[in-house]
């Protein structure tokens, strides 16, 4: 089941298997696919950089229990920056400063790519609520394409916006 993405993004909240696949390395296959998806979506992001921070980089007061330190480090060890181009120069922007739609694309895109790679079902409530209709259609179209969906993954979603199905993009594959 998909977890809604709001104003913040917590990659560990995506779900452990998806986030572990993304975060095990900035060279992982799913991270490369996610970078391509963000580029194709044309949200102004030129590249994505991830940096892993070690436990030693976090300075905790002595009174903070070890269990809380580990939990904090696990939740904050990855720093994600979206790289934009401005006047030919790279301009990194922290993920928390990105738009809700870009955060949604990063989080939902990871889930979509994970289920496309594994096969199975992705269920989402109000999948299109935090994103532009064209971006929503792009994510859904990945399920109707045999190249991007060779394992016949399925998408089940709810929406109150009937306009997203007006162009026939949601037909059965055959």
What is the meaning of each model-derived region?
Residues 1-105, 109, 117:
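Phosphate-coordinating catalytic segments in nucleotide- and nucleic-acid-processing enzymes
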